[in-house]
């Protein structure tokens, strides 16, 4: 296969991977963790994925510890856990 054909194939595979929605089975396991504000006392507006409602919800993060189900924006939460 020529290098142009390989580049086209790589481009198509990349496009397919970007456009394929995340199914429940492909969602990272940390998306199922509950919101955890952590032990510190900061007041940081964050978002977590709520697996029951299947929505990204706002919560206040204390600034340390917590868990991986913690995103700086609703969009980042959606991209990671909802595939949108």
From Swiss-Prot:
One of its GO terms (molecular function) is serine-type endopeptidase inhibitor activity. The record marks 41-42 as: Reactive bond for chymotrypsin. GO terms for cellular component: extracellular space. It comes from the Eukaryota. InterPro entries: Kunitz_BPTI, Kunitz_BPTI_sf, Prtase_inh_Kunz-CS, TFPI/VKTCI-like. PROSITE patterns: BPTI_KUNITZ_1, BPTI_KUNITZ_2. Residues 31-81 form the BPTI/Kunitz inhibitor domain. Disulfide bonds join 31-81, 40-64, 56-77. The keyword Disulfide bond applies. The keyword ATP-binding does not apply. Keywords: Disulfide bond, Protease inhibitor, Secreted, Serine protease inhibitor, Signal. Gene3D superfamilies: Pancreatic trypsin inhibitor Kunitz domain (4.10.410.10). Expressed by the venom gland. Residues 1-24 form the signal peptide. It is found in: Secreted. SMART domains: KU (SM00131). Its main location: secreted. Serine protease inhibitor. Belongs to the venom Kunitz-type family. PANTHER family: KUNITZ-TYPE PROTEASE INHIBITOR-RELATED, SERINE PEPTIDASE INHIBITOR, KUNITZ TYPE, 3. This is Kunitz-type serine protease inhibitor 3. It comes from Daboia russelii (Russel's viper).
């Amino acid at each position: 296969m020529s290098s142009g054909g390989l580049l086209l194939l790589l481009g198509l595979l990349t496009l397919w991977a970007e456009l394929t929605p995340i199914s429940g089975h492909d969602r990272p396991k940390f998306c199922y963790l509950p919101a955890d504000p952590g032990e510190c006392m900061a007041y940081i507006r964050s978002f977590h994925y709520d697996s029951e409602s299947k929505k990204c919800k706002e919560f206040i993060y204390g600034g340390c510890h917590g868990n991986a189900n913690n995103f700086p924006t609703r969009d980042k939460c959606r991209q990671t856990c909802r595939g949108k």
